[in-house]
């Protein structure tokens, strides 16, 4: 997959030279065209495979643990890798505004791409009033996003890195031609480790330093695991109850007098 191609460009210390994505000789090493190389760079940054630092790119620690030779998933074949990529795209608003907005702000039971275009344009203007996106850009981004989760019945374009990766997650379906709906409920392929990672990541973003987090926040807050993974209340509760054993009591669920919370001890 394309994320692996970006990772393979790393040299000593996890460094990736910026020229890797612009130099003609370097581009040849990817075996794809210039536009696709730009896409690889974009998605590698958006999915957290690498980050920009001091005039170069550096491979992220989690990406290295997953994609290195002998790593957790060196060929990016595991559903857990796909779930992590989804979390980076839809749980954070970094180079993935459309993904984040779709999973955190769209609440309609069904929707079409055309129905989403104007609300997304307003959201983008709110984030950056000085940067106006064309209608064609909004439409294209939405099409790419929707097709990465709900590929066409006849199969998608081979250039779209996300299509085979995220389509397996079962988060979005095309219920009628051009009409989509989220699939809410339990997600069998979502590993407890990925859910826990997302929970802690979300916690650090919205409530860093707090020792407890309300169930409603985990389930319904913007950027929460409940919203991003489209889990129902029962599924979230079951996962939170299992946290104590899974994390060796670093995270514990309590339900007392109707107050449902997750408690957190310092994580090493």
Task: Please name every model-derived segment.
Residues 1-268:
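Donor-sugar nucleotide-binding helix/loop cap in glycosyltransferases
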């Amino acid at each position: 997959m394309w994320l692996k191609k970006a990772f393979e460009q790393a040299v000593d210390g996890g460094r990736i030279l910026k020229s890797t994505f612009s130099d003609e000789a370097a581009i040849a090493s990817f075996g794809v065209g210039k536009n696709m190389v730009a896409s690889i760079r974009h998605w590698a940054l958006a999915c957290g495979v690498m980050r920009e630092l001091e005039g170069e790119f550096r491979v992220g620690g989690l990406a290295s643990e997953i994609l290195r030779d002998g790593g957790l998933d060196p060929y990016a074949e595991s559903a857990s890798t796909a779930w992590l990529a989804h979390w980076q795209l839809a749980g954070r608003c970094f180079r993935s505004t459309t993904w984040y907005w779709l999973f955190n702000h769209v609440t309609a039971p069904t929707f079409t791409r055309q129905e989403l275009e104007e609300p997304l344009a307003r959201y983008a203007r709110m984030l950056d009033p000085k940067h106006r996106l064309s209608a064609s850009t909004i439409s294209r981004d939405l099409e790419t996003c929707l097709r990465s989760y709900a590929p066409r019945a006849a199969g998608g374009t081979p250039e779209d890195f996300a299509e085979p990766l995220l389509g397996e997650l079962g988060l979005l379906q095309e219920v009628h031609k051009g009409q989509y709906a989220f699939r809410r409920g339990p997600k069998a392929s979502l590993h407890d480790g990925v859910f826990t990672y997302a929970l802690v990541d979300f916690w650090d973003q919205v409530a860093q330093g707090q020792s407890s987090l309300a169930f409603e926040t985990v389930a319904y807050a913007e950027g929460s695991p409940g919203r991003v993974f489209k889990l129902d209340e029962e599924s979230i509760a079951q996962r939170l109850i299992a946290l104590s054993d899974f994390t060796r009591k670093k995270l514990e669920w309590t339900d007392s007098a109707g107050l449902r919370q997750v408690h957190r001890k310092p994580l090493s």
